[in-house]
């Protein structure tokens, strides 16, 4: 007798997370694939990410998703098939999967998701909006008739949802996230320290030293190319510089999204509660 395995999949532009029903088995890998000569897959997930920005001309390492939408369905399907193999065994074949999808998908984008998922060796597929999945994951009262707001800052997008009675009553998705913050760090380091760094270095600086309000004052030595001399160089970057760069991005974009969500659409929540 074969036991049916059930697992949830969180498809992000930067990371793919897969967990079983009891959360005992979890896979968390970078959503990235490395391909040689546009034909041969040589690495997926974290191994492909380690090759990012270091590959020769014949190898490309990139994510098959951009801004929460599928850019290369074939490569995304290959990554998912590889990762789902970790949930299969002699006694568990063709699992049931629940997949989170972004808000405000167009019909074409939704068909792209279905095409990728139906190509996997799975038994049943269910889709759930990211806002609802986020709220359930952090233990919010999603079935209550009161509104609960969830803000998910991803790599490429920021999703803002108001959940009530198990549904997304208000949902907005904005095309900026951690990648925009990383670009702000790259720009700041180039402008203030005359040093050119890559995205991976900027991400490490943001994660290690970035804060939006109050945080510990520290610094980190980073290496890159001097923008004037063109030779390898280094600079000590204080956490204040990192935090100012990402705070400016958050103030200009994320808070604007919150204000838009609150001021424009809260009347929909009141209408839903009175219906």
Which functions belong to the PLM regions below?
Residues 1-150, 163-275:
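Nucleotide/phosphate-binding catalytic cleft detector across ATP-hydrolyzing
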